[in-house]
Design a protein with these regions (language model features):
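Bacterial N-terminal signal peptides that target proteins for export
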Residues: 1-13
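Bacterial N-terminal signal peptides
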Residues: 10-23, 367
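Noncatalytic, solvent-exposed loop/strand surfaces
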Residues: 24-455
Length: 455
């Protein structure tokens, strides 16, 4: 009895401490797509509408190239960008944008398709550490207080990795004491777990043994996979952790499809083929989990979306629906009260802003956001954008610098406010970041902070 009581007290204390930590971090945005990686913030007290010229500007700053979003935690903002021939990890005061420290290392990355040469992955922040993954696959752990290197792994040298299309762009996942990275190594190092404190390899899995001989589900004739040593594995989606039927899953939307792994051992739970028919294609949307279902989507060559239902044992999935109502390129939908709010379309002329019922795949409403790319004048449309949810409002960043505020309304596309952010132009492909009532927007050359606090 004493043992049971003592255990109960220990669990209660642990829960209490955990609740305190959550409360302290509720206004933070310490990793890609927010504290829970779901494009949502728990903040309230935000402006209900914006002036015509936009909300109050706090500060703005010229930054280097890249698509990496800033992360904010414990009074620190960290941006990963490239200046000339160096990738720079820069810690700033989130209230002013002033530099606190920088950490630099050489980079020779050149994008083969002409996009910018900066980092694509977003920093992960803890109380005392910062983890970054560069465009060439250099993985660093840096001290948050002084910006000094703690450890480094050069994944391109440590693993056999075919060159990625647009550089390394899958932000790692910190799960307990493991840093889980979609490395993309051959033949079976598609996903690698590193010890977060030391950088040592804990486990590696996914590759030839996962896909070789599998049917290419959804392809005409459903041919079998014949694995090649030059197969690219890493996608531009980031690993997602989820608890389904009481079991913890690491969900990785690889270039070939979705794989679920046990976070402790790396053992596969299940996999599902999901890839466009042509080589020049990518998967870039993070999986979205609701209950025992998982949504995956892509925009290349009519692949569309699939909702998968996980079996109670957690070792298999079945298709619930397959639809082209959402064809998502590089953004991740916001799930709110059973509906998905997202930008659909591969290219600028295909762009739509849509609401889709997650359980059925039914298109609820559709708004045309298509435009023809031009550098002469900013478009009035959002194009392909990103959205986050806070205070029952959707904050939308269009790819040419249009910033919008929407009500998440399944009845209609209810736009509250909209304005063109000065000095931001195409391509604005970085999702907005919200922390302590401050909105941070990043383009290829600017970092801008707005105050969204309601007076």
């Amino acid at each position: 009895m004493k043992s049971i009581c003592r255990k109960t007290l220990e669990l209660s204390a642990t829960f209490f401490l955990f609740a305190i930590v959550l409360d302290l971090q509720a206004a933070d945005w310490p990793r890609f797509l927010g504290i829970h990686a779901d494009c949502k913030s728990q903040e309230t007290g935000l402006l209900d509408a914006w002036p015509k010229e936009g909300p109050p500007l706090e500060w703005k700053k010229v930054v280097g190239t890249g698509y990496s979003a800033p992360s904010v935690s414990n009074g620190n903002l960290v941006l990963h960008h490239r200046i000339k021939k160096e990738e720079v990890v820069e810690s700033m005061d989130p209230s002013t944008g002033k530099t606190v420290w920088t950490f630099k290392y050489p980079s020779n990355y050149i994008d083969p398709f002409g996009y910018n040469n900066g980092p694509r992955c977003t920093p992960i922040l803890t109380q005392d550490r910062c983890y970054v993954l560069g465009a060439e696959g250099k993985l660093y752990c840096i001290g948050m207080q002084d910006g000094r290197e703690i450890w480094m792994r050069d994944t391109a040298k440590d693993f056999n990795i075919p060159e990625a299309f647009f550089g390394v762009g899958s932000t790692p996942l910190l799960e307990d004491d493991k840093l889980i990275v979609m490395v993309g190594g051959q033949p079976d190092s598609g996903v690698v777990a590193f010890e977060a404190s030391t950088g040592k390899t804990i486990w590696e899995n996914v590759g030839k043994k996962t896909w070789d001989g599998e049917r290419k589900t959804g392809w005409r004739g459903e041919p079998f996979v014949q694995w090649q040593e030059y197969e690219k594995q890493a996608s531009y989606a980031s690993p997602v952790a989820a608890t389904i039927h009481g079991q913890r899953h690491i969900l990785c939307l690889m270039r070939q499809g979705l794989v679920s792994l046990n976070p402790d051992t790396g053992k596969e739970n299940f996999h599902f083929w999901f890839r466009a028919r042509v080589n020049e294609s990518v998967n870039a949307m993070n999986p979205v989990v609701s209950g025992d279902t998982i949504l995956i989507s892509a925009a290349y060559y009519r692949i569309g979306s699939v909702l998968l239902k996980v079996a109670p044992g957690g070792t298999s999935v079945t298709e619930t629906w397959r639809s082209r109502a959402l064809e998502i390129h590089w953004t991740t939908p916001v799930l709110h009260e059973g509906n998905l709010y997202a930008f659909s379309g591969r290219n600028e002329p295909d762009a739509r802003f849509r609401c889709v019922e997650m359980a059925t795949g039914k298109l609820v409403w559709d708004q045309d956001e298509s435009w023809r790319k031009s550098y002469l004048a900013p478009p009035e449309k959002y194009g392909r954008g990103s959205a986050i949810l806070a205070d029952n409002k959707l904050i939308v960043m269009g790819e040419a610098g249009q910033l919008g505020l929407f009500r998440p309304n399944p009845g209609m596309a209810e736009e509250i406010s909209k304005f063109q952010v000065p000095e931001m132009k195409y391509p604005c492909w970085t999702a907005p970041v919200l922390s302590n009532h401050k909105l941070y927007l990043r383009s290829e050359s600017r970092l801008i902070c707005y105050d969204l606090k309601k007076n």
